From Swiss-Prot:
PANTHER family cross-referenced by the UniProt entry: METHIONYL-TRNA FORMYLTRANSFERASE, METHIONYL-TRNA FORMYLTRANSFERASE, MITOCHONDRIAL
Group of enzyme by EC: transferase
Protein name, as recorded: Methionyl-tRNA formyltransferase
PROSITE patterns the record matches: GART (PS00373)
SUPFAM superfamilies (UniProt xref): FMT C-terminal domain-like, Formyltransferase
Gene: fmt
InterPro entries, alphabetized: Fmt, Formyl_trans_C, Formyl_trans_C_sf, Formyl_transf_N, Formyl_transf_N_sf, Formyl_transferase-like_C_sf, GART_AS, Met-tRNA-FMT_C
Transmembrane regions: none
Entry keywords, A to Z: Protein biosynthesis, Transferase
Function: Attaches a formyl group to the free amino group of methionyl-tRNA(fMet). The formyl group appears to play a dual role in the initiator identity of N-formylmethionyl-tRNA by promoting its recognition by IF2 and preventing the misappropriation of this tRNA by the elongation apparatus.
Catalytic activity: L-methionyl-tRNA(fMet) + (6R)-10-formyltetrahydrofolate = N-formyl-L-methionyl-tRNA(fMet) + (6S)-5,6,7,8-tetrahydrofolate + H(+)
Residues the record lists as binding (6S)-5,6,7,8-tetrahydrofolate: S109, L110, L111, P112
Gene Ontology molecular-function annotations: methionyl-tRNA formyltransferase activity
Length: 309
């Protein structure tokens, strides 16, 4: 097929690579404009742009698709289909109507659950045991289009947003190739609005741990916010991130939430609203990530210390 591909991050780059490998003719690659990145804040190309250039594919980086110029550029491609994966720009109806077979989206959840910007993190936060990929026809609403195919991906107890992202990227790449090869046989299914839920965008403040919450919920938060924006709390008024943690076994002593119960090389144990959380990897402000043992080797932290203030 003649394909316009629209995407930006590594999740999307995996799908682009799979489409190229499957022999589809990628007539144009849309991706976000280069952005400042790194300590030097130099302009950096998106993962999709890098993949496209490596294959000699034409790249187009508009700031909007609402202009006549942008829409004319897409129309000139005479594409059979547009494949969209974490692109980051709104597709107006005029663009959705351009490809002969419409626009297909690779969404990282089992729709209609977790429509929206952060489906991977929301699935972990909610304690879901599985998530997946939905290939859907794009419509004007937020992830409301008819579903063409689904792939289930289990969520392991140790999965972070990063590891689950990688598993979903592989699944999404395979799913879109399969969907295009079987397109004529796929039957669109309308989403059940009664089962819809929304994966709101993450914020740094949301990633601040509330020690009043149960330990199991806080352990999920640490996994969900790893690597970005990173679960965090305060120690002596200074923020530090918690990168790996687990709910403690039963039997830890009772204490006000946020109180350090024990601090040794095996971990920093903190009382929660229910149970206790064991911190295994942390990152203090201005420092690199380190194990609890390494952190304690350079700083005294005694039982009774309060976190969060």
């Amino acid at each position: 097929m003649r394909v316009i591909f629209a995407g930006t991050p590594p999740f999307a780059a995996a799908a682009l690579e799979a489409l190229v490998a499957a022999g589809h003719e990628i007539v144009l690659v849309l991706t976000q404009p280069d952005r400042p990145a790194g300590r030097g804040m130099k302009l950096a190309a998106s993962a999709v742009k890098q993949a496209a250039l490596a294959h000699g594919l034409p790249v187009y980086q508009p700031t909007t698709l609402k202009t006549p110029e942008a829409q004319a550029r897409l129309a000139d491609c005479a594409a059979d289909v547009m494949v969209v994966a974490a692109y980051g720009l709104i597709l107006p109806q005029a663009v959705l109507d351009l490809p002969r077979l419409g626009c297909l989206n690779i969404h990282a959840s089992l729709l209609p659950r977790w429509r929206g910007a952060a489906p991977i993190q929301r699935a972990i936060l909610a304690g879901d045991c599985e998530t997946g990929i939905t290939i859907m026809q794009m419509a004007a609403g937020l992830d409301t289009g008819a579903m063409l195919a689904k792939t289930v991906v289990p969520i392991a107890d140790a999965d972070t947003a990063a590891t689950l992202h990688d598993a979903l990227a592989v699944a999404g790449a395979a799913a879109i190739v399969s969907a295009l090869s079987a397109y004529d046989t796929l039957v669109p299914q309308t989403q059940d609005e009664r089962e819809a839920s929304y994966a709101a965008k993450l914020s740094k403040e949301e990633a601040r741990l509330d020690w009043q919450q149960p330990a199991e919920a806080l352990a999920r938060a640490v996994r969900a916010f790893n690597p970005v924006p990173g679960a965090w709390t305060l120690l002596a008024g200074a923020p530090f991130k918690i990168l790996r943690a687990e709910a403690a076994p039963q039997g830890e002593a009772d204490a006000p939430p946020g109180t350090v119960l024990r601090a040794d090389p095996a971990g920093i144990v903190v009382a929660c609203g229910g149970g206790a959380l064991v911190l295994h990897e942390i990152q203090a402000a201005g420092s690199k990530r380190m194990t609890a043992a390494a952190f304690l080797a350079g700083r005294a932290l005694s039982a009774g210390t309060r976190l969060g203030a």
